[in-house]
Each structure stands twice: as structure tokens, then as C-alpha cells.
């Protein structure tokens, strides 16, 4: 739709969410009176009516497990995702840039917290989720296993990584699980600002000295393919897409979203005056979309398995932060217990 920005889509999803909460769900269906309704029938009716499943509702175990996996992976990504950018907080080129970056990294901590809270509504504790991350039993996004070598990488992360995140996450604002959908609306509004700040960093560099321009181009060259890989394996190799789409958790396949991202980035790269590192990139008039060279999915598989450039460093840092923060969590629990008159 012309002029339909990602933020317009988020606002539409927000309105749909409010409307859905006002409609009552018909759970009687066409079933004859003689046949007893099952909780599965009610669940199916809610999904078919595009209503939201709420924590109090019955849901199939596999639906619950899929949500826990995806929401936890998403939460872990936000928290681990603070590391590559955190690397540049003390080296930002001006006080203003530093303040903006600090605020962005704090937003990511906030996103992690909304998401852990959404996962907790499914009956699993945050401690348990964090333990699963640290023991390597849950994943986080492949993208955060790449290093941030120059200041331009902060621009490339904002433009490309937040850009990919928002293309992937806007449809999640219409996810069938209410707490996740509501968290995503808030997150997407903030991600949109993040993407613009990344674009602005790159725009400044690409219109600066030749050295700054080269630095911006080099960052885009390194972050382009890892960003395309963020959308996951091709649909044919995606384990969960089909079922997740049937449940209204995912709304689109990985390849479709990857294509939307490419179509969004090409004109933006032109405005930046930077090139995307793909000789195969060209307008395909028959499909009304850009043709592009896909990412190296073997590399994605290696990074997911733990063999990317920074996997070990990221997890070691997270483990250290968890250990060093233990006293803060204990003190907070003791303080809360004291205020409520109990023991921790
Ligand atoms: N990295 O069957 P599918 C952000 C795994 S937040 C690692 O297609 P699904 C904000 C997948 O888990 C970025 N693993 O899976 C920010 C599955 O493994 P399993 C995070 C990946 O779930 C910006 C297997 O491969 N966003 O960037 C990846 O249907 C800047 C088969 O894949 C989200 O988490 C990958 N890239 O689709 C923060 C969004 N791709 O569990 C800081 C929510 C796939 O069977 C700075 N998540 N895998 O062993 C989703 O939309 C989906 O989970 C997908 C994957 C699309 C990521």
C-alpha cells in the first residue's frame, strides 16, 4: 500500500487488538447439540475468529511450547543484543551520540523485560529461561554473534538489524497470543526510532569525508548478509513456520519477510548513497520485487550451532554479568520481602 509505513501497520494492529477485545467469541460453532464441545474446539474457534488467546485460556501444549521458545529466544536476543552496541557507548564520537546510544541500549533491556514478562504468563519463570540460555538450551538471534569493528557498525546495526527486526516484528503485533502481541506493539514503536537513528548515523558518515564514507560502506558490506540471515532458514527448511502460521503466531514465512526487507532497503540505500554488496541485486519487473542473492545458510547454521565469530564471547559475558549481578537480585528480593513483612 502506498505510503503505508511500518508504523502505520503497527497502529492498525493496535486498533485491531482493541476491537478484538470488544468482540465476543462465538465458541458454539456449527457443532450439533448432541456433541460435547472440547477445550480444543474453543481454542480453534478463538484462533479462527482472529481473537487473542490469553494466559487464562486453555491452549495445546505444543502451542504453549512454541510460544515459550520463540518469546524466550526473542527476549534473550534483546539482552545479548545489548553487547555489540554497548561496546561503543564509551567511544561514541560525541556526547549527543553517546546519550542516544545509551538510551537505545536501555530500550533493548526494556524490550527484554517486556518479553520475559510475556513468557512468564505461559507458566515459566524468568530464572528458568535465563538458565536455559546460559546452558545453551535456548537460542538467541544469530546476528549478535558478529563484531562491531567501527562506529559505522552502530549505524549499520540501527539501519539494517533494527530494520530487519521491525520487518519481522510488525506482523507479530497480530500474533494470536495476547501478551506477546501487546508487547510487540510497544517494541515496534521503539524499534522504528532505532532504525531511524541508525540511518541518520550512516547518512552523516556517507556524506562526510571520503574516509567516513568508506567506513559506512564497509559496515554495510559486513552487516548486509548477517541481517538477511536473521529471518531464519528458507521456508523449505523452516521447522516451525507452517504450524506457527496455522496458529496465527507467525503471519508470514521467513522468505516472504526477507524479500520485504530487501525491497525496503534498496531505495533507502540509494538515499544513503551506499551500495548493497550483492552483484545479483536487480529489479525484477515480472515479480514486481527485487531479485537478490540469498545469504549463506550454511553460515547461518554454523552461527546458530555456536560457531560464529563472537558466540563464546557473548555467552561468557552474559554468564559473568549474571554472576556479578547475583547480589543485586538477592538484595532486591530481601528488600521486597522486608517491605511486605515476609522473609526472602
Ligand atoms: N538466529 O523453523 P524456523 C532484535 C532457529 S531482536 C538463531 O524458521 P521460527 C532487536 C529457530 O529458532 C532479534 N536461531 O524457526 C535488536 C529454530 O530452532 P529450534 C530476534 C534461528 O521460530 C536490534 C530453527 O532455527 N528476533 O534484533 C534464527 O519459526 C538491535 C528453525 O527455524 C526475534 O526473535 C536466527 N536468526 O522462525 C536488539 C523475533 N532463525 O528452536 C538489539 C521473533 C531461525 O527449532 C540491537 N522470532 N533460528 O531449535 C521469530 O520471528 C522467529 O523465531 C524466527 C525464526 C523468524 C527468528
Give names to the regions the model predicted.
Residues 2-21, 214-344:
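Extended, helix-rich structural scaffolds rather than catalytic motifs
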Residues 57-63, 81-103, 165-180:
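Helix-loop segments that flank and shape redox-cofactor active sites
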Residues 52-72, 132-158, 175, 208-212, ...:
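Acidic/His metal-coordination segments adjacent to aromatic residues that form catalytic metal sites
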Residues 1-63, 95, 326-344:
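Extreme N-terminal leader/anchor segments
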Residues 22-40, 104-132, 199-202:
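Conserved alpha-helical segments that form or flank metal/cofactor-binding pockets of metalloenzymes
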Residues 146-197:
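Internal, conserved structured core segments that host functional sites
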Amino acid at each position: 500500500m502506498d505510503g503505508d509505513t511500518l508504523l502505520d501497520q503497527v497502529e492498525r494492529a493496535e486498533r485491531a487488538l482493541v476491537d478484538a477485545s470488544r468482540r465476543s467469541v462465538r465458541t458454539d460453532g456449527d457443532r450439533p447439540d448432541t456433541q460435547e464441545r472440547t477445550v480444543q474446539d474453543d481454542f480453534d474457534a478463538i484462533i479462527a475468529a482472529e481473537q487473542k488467546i490469553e494466559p487464562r485460556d486453555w491452549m495445546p501444549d505444543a502451542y504453549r511450547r512454541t510460544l515459550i521458545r520463540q518469546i524466550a529466544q526473542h527476549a534473550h536476543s534483546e539482552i545479548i543484543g545489548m553487547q555489540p552496541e554497548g561496546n561503543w557507548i564509551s567511544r561514541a564520537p560525541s556526547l549527543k551520540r553517546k546519550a542516544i546510544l545509551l538510551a537505545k541500549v536501555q530500550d533493548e533491556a526494556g524490550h527484554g523485560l517486556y518479553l520475559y514478562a510475556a513468557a512468564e504468563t505461559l507458566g515459566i519463570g524468568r530464572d528458568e529461561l535465563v538458565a536455559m540460555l546460559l546452558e545453551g538450551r535456548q537460542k538467541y538471534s544469530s546476528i549478535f554473534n558478529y563484531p562491531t569493528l567501527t562506529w559505522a557498525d552502530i549505524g549499520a546495526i540501527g539501519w539494517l538489524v533494527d530494520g530487519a527486526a521491525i520487518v519481522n516484528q510488525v506482523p507479530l503485533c497480530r500474533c494470536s497470543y495476547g501478551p506477546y502481541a501487546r508487547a510487540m506493539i510497544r517494541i515496534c514503536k521503539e524499534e522504528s526510532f532505532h532504525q531511524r537513528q541508525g540511518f541518520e548515523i550512516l547518512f552523516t558518515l556517507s556524506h562526510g569525508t571520503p574516509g567516513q564514507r568508506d567506513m559506512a560502506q564497509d559496515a554495510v558490506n559486513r552487516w548486509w548478509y548477517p541481517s538477511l540471515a536473521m529471518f531464519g532458514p528458507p521456508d523449505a527448511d523452516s521447522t516451525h513456520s507452517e504450524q506457527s502460521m496455522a496458529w496465527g503466531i507467525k503471519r508470514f514465512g521467513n522468505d516472504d519477510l526477507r524479500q520485504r526487507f530487501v525491497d525496503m532497503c534498496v531505495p533507502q540505500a540509494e538515499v544513503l548513497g551506499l551500495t548493497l554488496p550483492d552483484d545479483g541485486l536487480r529489479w525484477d519487473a515480472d515479480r514486481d520485487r527485487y531479485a537478490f542473492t540469498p545469504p549463506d545458510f550454511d553460515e547461518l547454521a554454523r552461527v546458530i550451532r555456536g560457531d560464529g565469530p563472537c558466540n563464546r564471547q557473548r555467552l561468557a559475558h552474559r554468564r559473568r554479568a549474571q554472576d556479578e549481578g547475583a547480589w543485586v537480585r538477592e538484595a532486591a528480593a530481601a528488600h521486597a520481602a522486608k517491605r511486605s513483612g515476609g522473609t526472602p
